[in-house]
Amino acid sequence: SMLSVLKNLGKVGLGFVACKINKQC
């Protein structure tokens, strides 16, 4: 469903932001 897709994108987005902040990419 669209909701599950958005949730997955949100998880990926948060992971990417945390990666950038921590500079541990």
UniProtKB/Swiss-Prot annotation:
GO terms for cellular component: extracellular region. Keywords: Amphibian defense peptide, Antibiotic, Antimicrobial, Disulfide bond, Fungicide, Secreted. It comes from the Eukaryota. GO terms for biological process: defense response to bacterium; defense response to fungus; killing of cells of another organism. Belongs to the frog skin active peptide (FSAP) family. Ranatuerin subfamily. Disulfide bonds join 19-25. It is found in: Secreted. Antibacterial activity against Gram-positive bacterium S.aureus (MIC=50 uM) and Gram-negative bacterium E.coli (MIC=2 uM). Has activity against C.albicans (MIC=70 uM). Shows no detectable hemolytic activity towards human erythrocytes. Expressed by the skin glands. This is Ranatuerin-1.
